[in-house]
Every structure is written in C-alpha cells, then in structure tokens.
Amino acid sequence: MKYMIASASLLGLLASPAQAQLQAVSDLTLNAAQKLSTAAMAACEAKGRQIVVTVLDRGGNIVSVQRADGVGPHNTEASRRKAYTALSTRTDTQTLAANARANPDAANLTTLPELLLLGGGLPLTARGHIVGAIGVAGGGGALHDRACAQAAIAAAPELDPVLLPTKETP
C-alpha cells in the first residue's frame, strides 16, 4: 500500500510540468537611447561644450553613440567606458572616483581594464531596475560631463531620477 501511494505521488509529480519562473525585465529601446543621447548633446551644447555620449543597454551593448563635431577620438572610448563602469558598478562614476581616492581598497578598481573612474557615467534605472547606462566625455571635465548625463536622464520621464550630491555641481 505504501509502495502504491509513493508510486502514485511520484507519477503525479512527474506528470505535472514544472513551471519555469521567468523574470520580467525592462529593456532600453533604440528610440529611448537616441533621445537620451540627443538630450545630453543639447544640454552640453547649451553650455558651449562639445561631447561624445554613449548609451548602453542592461547587457552592456552599445545602443547609441553620438559625437559632436571636432571632439577628439579618445572621448568616444572614454564615454563608452564611463557608461560601462556605471552599468557594471551600478554607481555614478564621479562618486566611484571619489570613493577610490578616499579608500585604499576601492583604489584597486583603477586596475580593472574596462573601468574608467572619471565623472560622466550614470546608471539608468526604471522602476528601481537597471536598464542601462549613459557615459559622457569631452565636455571639459568630469563634473561637466556628469551634468550633461544627468540632464539627459532628467529629460526622460520613463527613467528614475538620479539623485547626486549637490556640492560638486559645476
């Protein structure tokens, strides 16, 4: 009798398909990435600054890159690395750079080849979940780059606002 009950229970478990639990995630669209890039370019241009802006999706793939006329080629790679750093660490790169200067353990982050600890990279979140990152370079300094990235996020109502320290505003 015990054998029959155990067998029936086992057959019941095998017969019912296990339901896979899939996580619903938000993806950054090409349209959204282009709007962010355009907003960052406009914010910097309004201040007389020429930049390169790179937007990555949550997987670290480049979705959009825009470069103003005359911006040095090294800034294209710098903007990508700032975005990658913000995405990978889920941290504003200006804050990350300050932490690395203040903390010897965090200073080791500078030895990782893809990370760039300069201001201008911000993670992009929607409803509390990372959806990508933006990186700005060439705007005349880390604080200017960060301000243009922040202005782009502020112009995208579908993204969560970025709360940054106010004492470092250019």
Pin down the residues of each PLM region:
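Bacterial N-terminal signal peptides that target proteins for export
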Residues: 1-7
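Flexible, solvent-exposed loop/hinge segments and secondary-structure transition points
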Residues: 20-170
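N-terminal signal peptide c-region/cleavage motif recognized by signal peptidases
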Residues: 15-17
